[in-house]
Amino acid sequence: MAGRSFTFVSGAGSPLSGHLEPPEGTPRGWAIFAHCCTCGKDSRAAVHISRALSRAGIGVLRFDFAGTGIGGGTGEPVNFASDVEDLRAAANAMAAAGMSPSLLVGHSLGGTAAIVAAADMPDIAAVATIGAPADLQHILRLFGPNDLDTIASEGEASVEIAGRPFLIRRGFLEAVEGIDVEKAIASLRRPVLVMHSPLDQVVGIDHASRIFVASRHPKSFISLDNADHLLTDVADANYAAAMVAVWASRFLPPLSADLPQVEVAEGVVSTETLAGTFQLKVRSGEH
């Protein structure tokens, strides 16, 4: 089924731009994908993982947090607390549209936000993180040498992260000090999947260890061998997507046996699998 736009209002009252990836037939569940700090809803990881979940029967909303992407939040200050509220607002908007989510998937800081947000989202059955930091102090290491002084003296600063400017205000630093991520993980008591590359140069593998240890069972860990933090290699993005889809299927209702039949085109139909170069799915009639 073709994707479509989905705009909703953030906790702060700003419109946020989203994209729905519905599955064919009756969804077995709905998920929200939270992008990384320097990404957006159309990043490679966001797109591939959303589409993989859709093929597994799980509909997905990926959206731009306030301050990123093309949504109405563009130009607003980056604020971890608002990211958490944006996730909750997205879930409420989906529920109002008859698509109540039961899965959160977060990449990098989006994974940390998903963990914190899920604590107050009882309908969320499971949380998956990809390259997520185990504490918010980690992001301060990405700031320039004078950024913290500027924020302290002027209340805000334009901070360059991964080549992009982000408006950071004093409230962000207060959130960094005030949120205990590992405590939030320990109190979550929901299935957690931790995915991380041992070669991650942005968020070290030790963060994955801390998240995994703090999580309660059932919990799972998958190593993203040779992947970089942003999953820029399409093969790494596809692998992560496939693993999330398989893992999530254990915590959602089974695929319905009476799914609507997809109209079969005459002749031979080939479609890209998105699993790598030269890989096609070929269908001839009903075969």
What residue ranges belong to the model's regions?
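The serine-hydrolase catalytic nucleophile loop
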Residues: 37-50, 65
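Conserved alpha/beta-hydrolase
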Residues: 50-72
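Hydrolase active-site cap/lid region
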Residues: 122-171
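Catalytic histidine-centered segment of alpha/beta-hydrolase-like enzymes
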Residues: 227-239
